[in-house]
């Protein structure tokens, strides 16, 4: 969800309060509770759950193992419920071209870093950085490169963006900020042997108009760019 005008761009970031997280927290809690009750039933010799008679399950080793899995699962589900309750990772990104200020806010865990807030000048932005990891578990992360501060991620690592979605978002943001886009390509076998890949500027948005940028973002694919390893496409 975002609101955008000619000079201001505000994007609301969804945190841990997602439907998928709620489903996983419920499933994990119920499953862990069932394992723990079965293990306790085998120890007490009483049928706390009618579906699993305690006489058919020995406390050693089946009951101990199921109790351990149940306790571990309850800890993990408690962690998930806490992140949902505190809405960790939610916040907003505000780009004000009129005042030349960028504000990035995120909610964290309770404590010193409960409120994570970054504020810097728009002229300090070097580029929009797009990291694409290919392999069995692909990852696409969009971040903003700041002088003397490094890169600040704008998207979560667990967000499943398609190549077209991440390209479109990077192109629109780069055009709004008038900065170039840097693409970092990594593969699993390259990462293990040679580290991360070198950045390549896909195209410079400062030299393109709005119509040209939309046309360029539709035709330039990150996948084809990585396959062919071409030089940066210039306007």
From Swiss-Prot:
GO terms for cellular component: chloroplast thylakoid membrane; photosystem I. Pfam families: Ycf4. Keywords: Chloroplast, Membrane, Photosynthesis, Plastid, Thylakoid, Transmembrane, Transmembrane helix. Its main location: plastid. One of its GO terms (biological process) is photosynthesis. It is a multi-pass membrane protein. Seems to be required for the assembly of the photosystem I complex. This is Photosystem I assembly protein Ycf4. The lineage of its organism: Eukaryota, Viridiplantae, Streptophyta, Embryophyta, Tracheophyta. The gene is ycf4.
